[in-house]
Amino acid sequence: MSLMTKLGFRALVASCLIAAGGAAHAQVNVLITGVGSTQFPIATANFVNEASLPQQVTSVVRGDLARSGKFSNVDAGSTPVPETASVDFGAWKAKGANAFVAGSVNREPNGQYKVNFILYDTVKQQSLGGLSLTTSNDNEGMRKTGHKIADYIYQKLLGVRGVFNTRLSYVQRTGNVYKLLISDSDGQNAIPALTSKEPIISPAWSPSGTKVAYVSFELRKPVVYIHDLPTGRRYVISNQKGNNSAPAWSPDGQTLAVALSLTGNTQIYSVSSTGTGLRRLTRSSSIDTEPFYSPDGKWIYFTSDRGGAPQIYRMPAEGESAGAAQRVTFTGSYNTSPRVSPDGKLLAYISRTGGGFKLYVQDLQSGAANAVTNTTRDESPSFAANGQYILYATQSGGRSVLAAVPSDGSAPPQILSVQGGAIREPSWGPFMQ
């Protein structure tokens, strides 16, 4: 199979091999398949007054912490505990909890709800602070509040910003219908941004988290669009002769790198976020595709078969006219789909290994690379905004699913799937503004 066939149409070919049926954007199921080697035991008591809510905030918090693989939920019992209550640190420590969360939900005169909570360190017997959050009394509002609380806990106890209150984009295929879906980080609250009878591939979040670029085949050829999520407006960014594919945002959100077959072999170009100022960046006789900007905006990583087989290279963001491309991957003979971590230290990519395709992570300073999954049909990696996790597409039980794995490979992947449908092409959104 040629590099163009493998990369340019991988999602289309894969999805056509999957028989799918069932309801549109069905509920996503999350299967926790493993946990980290070290977990922080925490007890989250039921919040006062939350029992009658359409969505209990604490169930979202516990679910987020469990899915992270970094925490173990200690049974806090069924009795609600307000944040104003005095804390018996010894009793909670005796239950096995090194941290404890208490809180309440109260209706405001304007109909909104105030959610208050405090996080306690039971070992040091001290408060780690808390938040007072205002939300609407609906499923979406309460879930978002729960994600914010989990983010607070994650950062206070682990020293790293949490990503529970972020969003995912991915493509679901049900029969001959394709949907570009936007969901919470746990796959819940999925909302279709686009529905089409033609394939949709390569969604990519803007740095602001308000736009998603993607490739649609609705014009009977691949065309790059940008979708403005708050307004629902979408517009064409690249509809050049031949294939238009693989959009990638610059860190400032002003430019996109795209792969175009405008002159024959696919090459990498840049274009403004308004669709103007097309500029060619690579000038090789090979296939150059799958561009991705480094977080500092100085480099573009990309896949090329200029060495005979696909490998990952990088060049100055201004293009090869500003400096020759340099090969980056040397482990394995077939490497594609480069994605750089938000701190610029790690490179995630897909490597053909033993007849399968596995997600690898390479330290960009040392060059050391290791597989981080136990699956063998991996594709489309995407780092979480904090760099701690990688979302990717794979196969599980004969179905197309999404999976999330710690970027250091310290725990098995967690599977996100839908009943009767195939989900692919994931992209993990940035921190919410």
From Swiss-Prot:
GO cellular component terms attached to this protein's record: periplasmic space
PANTHER family attached to this UniProt entry: PROTEIN TOLB, PROTEIN TOLB HOMOLOG
Function: Part of the Tol-Pal system, which plays a role in outer membrane invagination during cell division and is important for maintaining outer membrane integrity.
Keyword Signal part of the UniProt annotation: yes
Keyword field: Cell cycle, Cell division, Periplasm, Signal
Family per similarity comment: Belongs to the TolB family.
Gene behind the chain: tolB
Range of residues in the leader sequence: 1-26
Main location: periplasm
Cell compartment(s), UniProt: Periplasm
Identification of the protein by name: Tol-Pal system protein TolB
Subunit details: The Tol-Pal system is composed of five core proteins: the inner membrane proteins TolA, TolQ and TolR, the periplasmic protein TolB and the outer membrane protein Pal. They form a network linking the inner and outer membranes and the peptidoglycan layer.
Pfam family, one: TolB_N
Superkingdom assignment: Bacteria
Record NCBIfam families: propeller_TolB
Entry annotated with the keyword Cell cycle: yes
